Curated annotation (Swiss-Prot):
InterPro entries: GDT1-like. Disulfide bonds: none annotated. It comes from the Eukaryota. This is GDT1-like protein 5. GO terms for molecular function: metal ion transmembrane transporter activity. It is found in: Membrane. Its main location: membrane.
């Protein structure tokens, strides 16, 4: 297992390049244009931090369920696999912001449904208030919306699986801290910069950079001896 600093550095670089042009990054940017920034930032960051901790915990537990040798080999395979996947995405990417447009369309559709529902009668509104989810009594609906979009957007994502693999091979605490710092930087930039910043990001460059980083991690993992 690597040092805390090594886990922190790898996680910081990997998470930053994975998230800077990711779907959740664009979602945070667009949500921040429509709702109070502090609620959007709090909801998005909370979801990403929870996901990072869950992923690192799974990675930490993996060597206790199967041998460290196998977790090391699986992690190496994941790094190479994600590296080739990202490079492929980068080479076929036209350089535009197709994902930004896709996320915006999804959020517009969701907003339209919300507006249609708000036109119901007062009786239906009262019934909805009575059936309001338990969490809305403690958290703002905007916070919960930002949280759910980011949490489920990250679930099963390439960055989540990579975090699990990294935590299985490196210091889990370092991986968590590096991931949280990177998530904070990316999400804050998205919320403050909004759509204007998101539209300036080259998905192609981000994908190629992330792919090369994964390949480097894969080579390093391949050359690193497995602890007994």
């Amino acid at each position: 297992m690597g040092s805390l600093l090594q886990g922190f550095t790898k996680s910081l670089a990997m998470t930053f390049l994975s998230e800077i042009g990711d779907k959740t990054f664009f979602a945070a940017a667009i949500l921040a244009m429509r709702y109070p920034r502090r609620l959007v930032l709090a909801g998005c960051l909370s979801a990403l931090i929870v996901m990072t901790i869950l992923s690192a915990t799974l990675g930490w537990a993996a060597p206790n369920l199967i041998s460290r040798k196998w977790t090391h080999h699986i992690t190496t395979f994941l790094f190479f696999g994600f590296g080739l996947w990202s490079l492929w995405d980068g080479f076929k990417e036209g350089g535009g912001s197709e994902e930004l447009a896709e996320v915006e369309a999804e959020l517009d559709s969701d907003l339209k449904k919300t507006n249609d529902q708000s036109k119901n009668s007062k009786i239906e509104d009262e019934q909805k208030k009575q059936k309001r989810p338990f969490l809305t009594a403690f958290f703002s609906p905007i916070f919960l919306k930002a949280f759910s979009i980011n949490f489920f957007g990250e679930w099963g994502d390439k960055s989540q699986l990579a975090t699990i693999g990294l935590a299985a091979d490196e210091n889990p605490l370092g991986v968590v801290l590096g991931g949280i710092v990177a998530q904070t930087l990316c999400t804050t930039a998205a919320v403050l910069g909004g759509k204007s910043l998101a539209s300036q990001i080259s998905e192609r460059i981000v994908a190629l950079s992330g792919g090369m980083l994964f390949i480097i991690f894969g080579i390093q993992s391949l050359l690193t001896p497995v602890d007994a």
